[in-house]
Design a protein with these regions (language model features):
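Short, glycine/charged-rich beta-strand-loop motifs at protein surfaces that mediate ligand recognition
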Residues: 43-44, 89-92
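Short, charged low-complexity intrinsically disordered segments located at boundaries
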Residues: 28-31, 87-89, 135-137
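Accessory nucleic acid-recognition modules appended to NTPase machines
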Residues: 1-84
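A generic structural signal for short hydrophobic patches within well-formed alpha-helices
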Residues: 35, 138-139
Length: 140
């Protein structure tokens, strides 16, 4: 299916070791309608759809996109275009008293933009200095 251009395989990148991790890629679909047609159900995980949408938007903006790994934490996206590097976490919503999305950023190298993208307007704001942006604001 990858050769049919239905999916993008995104490599995992070890941020600390600055190397690609073999065999640990993550897949994103070119068209979410394809997944829905194959699964024949309407309730595809919203978090997956939002993450897939952010991935496609980053590609359209000319970023090279990786899935980041730092120690045992996953960073949804490391997006790089020339010298511009962004660390991005994507979530449908941030549960109360849950710091998983921001904790993944705590030990990352400084100097690069960090951002959490959410589908919940109530989450928009700032968590420990990290901007939390609504998906619509990210897309425009």
């Amino acid at each position: 299916m990858h050769n049919a251009f239905l999916f993008y395989k995104v490599p995992r990148f070890d941020i600390r070791g600055k190397e690609y991790l073999r065999g640990q890629g993550k897949y994103y679909v070119v068209d979410l309608g394809f997944i829905r047609s194959q699964l024949q159900r309407k309730n595809i995980n919203r978090g997956f759809k939002i993450e897939n949408l952010v991935f496609l938007e980053l590609l359209s903006r000319g970023y090279e996109v990786f899935v980041g790994k730092y120690n045992d934490k996953e960073i949804d996206f490391v997006a790089q275009k020339d010298e511009d590097v962004k660390y991005i976490q994507v979530t449908d919503h941030i549960p109360e008293n849950n710091t998983r999305e921001s904790d993944n950023f705590l030990h990352l190298p400084t100097g690069y933009q960090k951002m959490i993208i959410t589908n919940n307007w109530d989450d928009v704001g700032n968590i420990e200095g990290i901007p939390v942006v609504h998906i619509i604001d990210f897309l425009i």
